[in-house]
């Protein structure tokens, strides 16, 4: 590994900050009072569990976790096996079909295989109430994920940031474009995909950048883990 620093090394202090402890306490209190919160507690930090800091090659920023039953599991845009593929992810698959030779759309939306290759699938807010989009947007998660982005910016070099939509682009404004490769496009949502997400070629461009740096490109074909097949 090129960079031995771990998330634990760089985030331990942040996780002791009063705002962060308040965020965790608010989420825990809501769960205890019977409110359904997504993703389940054990999955909230999966993006960091599956993609260690030293392994990050690509960052894809999402916004809110999915707020439907069984969808969110801690990786932006991804859903568990057996759950219908959400519209934004379907549009990502369409872009992949149109630009990556041999890519065929999978019958699932589970992106763990991307995460295991170094694609940090980071939502900027890490929890949500069932059926209530953006219900946890002001809890403090944004402060935490701002810190995460600044730490990647500081401790890594040559990371590709895929910033889709105005929210991600504002969030990524701090990224040093001399150190990293920033690609911007409209969001893959059906509301905006036809305004320039389709044809943005980001998946190809990300791999070209990685190859130029002598790194292994991402295999964008999502593969289910053996236990899910």
UniProtKB/Swiss-Prot annotation:
<keyword id="KW-0963">Cytoplasm</keyword>
<dbReference type="Pfam" id="PF03167">
    <property type="entry name" value="UDG"/>
</dbReference>
<dbReference type="GO" id="GO:0004844">
    <property type="term" value="F:uracil DNA N-glycosylase activity"/>
</dbReference>
<dbReference type="GO" id="GO:0005737">
    <property type="term" value="C:cytoplasm"/>
</dbReference>
<feature type="active site" description="Proton acceptor">
    <location>
        <position position="64"/>
    </location>
</feature>
<keyword id="KW-0227">DNA damage</keyword>
<keyword id="KW-0378">Hydrolase</keyword>
<dbReference type="InterPro" id="IPR002043">
    <property type="entry name" value="UDG_fam1"/>
</dbReference>
<protein>
    <recommendedName>
        <fullName>Uracil-DNA glycosylase</fullName>
        <ecNumber>3.2.2.27</ecNumber>
    </recommendedName>
</protein>
<comment type="function">
    <text>Excises uracil residues from the DNA which can arise as a result of misincorporation of dUMP residues by DNA polymerase or due to deamination of cytosine.</text>
</comment>
<comment type="similarity">
    <text>Belongs to the uracil-DNA glycosylase (UDG) superfamily. UNG family.</text>
</comment>
<dbReference type="GO" id="GO:0097510">
    <property type="term" value="P:base-excision repair, AP site formation via deaminated base removal"/>
</dbReference>
<dbReference type="InterPro" id="IPR018085">
    <property type="entry name" value="Ura-DNA_Glyclase_AS"/>
</dbReference>
<dbReference type="InterPro" id="IPR005122">
    <property type="entry name" value="Uracil-DNA_glycosylase-like"/>
</dbReference>
<keyword id="KW-0234">DNA repair</keyword>
<dbReference type="InterPro" id="IPR036895">
    <property type="entry name" value="Uracil-DNA_glycosylase-like_sf"/>
</dbReference>
